[in-house]
Amino acid sequence: MIKEFKKFIMKGSILDMAVGLVIGAAFTKIVNSFVDDILMPPIGMILSGIDFSNIFIVIKKGTDTLGNYNSIEAARNAGAVVIGIGVFINAIISFIITALSLFIIIKLFNKIQEKTVKKEKDEKESKEKVCPYCYSSININAVKCPNCTSDLDVK
């Protein structure tokens, strides 16, 4: 059972997935920091100094009977039930940036992969010709077809 587990873990796809998860988690932290620390503060400043992370609705007041909370953390610490609209907006923006970034990365990767496959195909085609008798693909230097054994014209 341990040997099977080692074999399973050492498969390339499992290792690729693990690396992808680690890189994805790091990338998510970078995007979240970009949204929270770089993108949203100027947008909040343009919109009359709004801090999006502190936009919230109190559904039920907490232990503080006044219910005037300066931040979502203060409301939650007081035991209030809140809907964190601003935090949700930040999460949506982070998701959109992450999805767009991944889309661009995958598109570039696919384009590079297509060029590589096309180059390999062109190289393969330049090393082969078609037998005029059986229409099999054969080496360009062949003087006799290995499939139908016909003699070929040498050019």
UniProtKB/Swiss-Prot annotation:
Q: Which Gene3D superfamilies match?
A: Large-conductance mechanosensitive channel, MscL, domain 1
One annotated Gene Ontology cellular component of this protein: plasma membrane
Instruction: Quote the Pfam families the UniProt record gives.
Output: MscL (PF01741)
User: Where would you find this protein in the cell?
Assistant: Cell inner membrane
Q: Name one GO molecular function term.
A: mechanosensitive monoatomic ion channel activity
Keywords noted in UniProt: Cell inner membrane, Cell membrane, Ion channel, Ion transport, Membrane, Transmembrane, Transmembrane helix, Transport
Q: Which domain of life is it from?
A: Bacteria
Report the transmembrane regions from the record: 8-28, 38-58, 85-105
Tell me the membrane topology, using the record's own terms.
Multi-pass membrane protein
Read off the HAMAP family from this record: MscL (MF_00115)
As for family, the record states: Belongs to the MscL family.
So what does this one do? Answer: Channel that opens in response to stretch forces in the membrane lipid bilayer. May participate in the regulation of osmotic pressure changes within the cell.
User: PANTHER family given for it?
Assistant: LARGE-CONDUCTANCE MECHANOSENSITIVE CHANNEL, MECHANOSENSITIVE CHANNEL MSCL
Q: How does it assemble?
A: Homopentamer.
The record's NCBIfam families line, in alphabetical order, gives: mscL
Quote the protein name from its UniProt record.
Large-conductance mechanosensitive channel
Gene symbol of the encoding locus: mscL
